Amino acid sequence: MEQKFYDAVAASPIIAAVKNMEGLEQCLATDSIQVVFLLFGDICSIGDIVAQVKQAGKLAMVHADLVTGLSGSKEIAVDFLHSATQADGIISTRPNFIRRARELHLYTVLRVFVIDSMALSGVEKLESVHPDFLEVLPGVMPKTIRKICAAVHTPVLAGGLIADKEDVLAALSAGAMAISTTNQQVWMM
């Protein structure tokens, strides 16, 4: 794992997940936010969006699955983000995207939706792609987060449905290193 990314997450365990320009403006004005998860944009705008994050001195992580125009499951999407933006890394649910990003020396977050026991049992297998972080969604399942943290060697993030301080503390107490949220009130904690 790249130490800079790990250190930024450790120093600021609340990650701003941004889904629109209004949220971007708010997170850029929030000094405590060091890492930004970009959950919006298209192939025409993502370079400018990333540039704003970088100009604010924050790490920019682009959710490769959510950039309009990068459809399909081809690794060329990761190549595009690497060559056409200043993104520090990617977020994806696709192991092949994570592998390609690692080859390009980008930071990586593999998102895992834990919706049932089969998904939970598959988490350990996903670790074989060696992401920098596993992000468990939804992030409001402390017992499940605790099980995953005990089963894997990759640091865990919790994301999705985190609405208040209680959710943040429960996820962190369960072993998550940080949380990501679109909830702007949580960013201010």
Placement of each model-derived feature along the sequence:
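Structural motif
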Residues: 30-31, 84-85, 104, 129, ...
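Histidine/lysine/aspartate-rich catalytic loop segments that bind and position anionic ligands
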Residues: 95-126
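Short, acidic/polar
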Residues: 17-29, 73-80, 117-126, 164-168
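Hydrophobic faces of well-ordered beta-strands that scaffold small-molecule active sites
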Residues: 14-18, 35-38, 60-64, 90-91, ...
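Conserved, mostly hydrophobic/aromatic
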Residues: 27, 94, 134, 171
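Ordered, amphipathic secondary-structure segments that act as subunit-interaction surfaces
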Residues: 73-97
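Glycine-rich phosphate-binding active-site loops on the catalytic face of alpha/beta enzymes
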Residues: 38-42, 138-144, 160-189
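Conserved N-terminal beta1-alpha1 strand-loop-helix module at the mouth
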Residues: 1-61, 68-71, 86-87
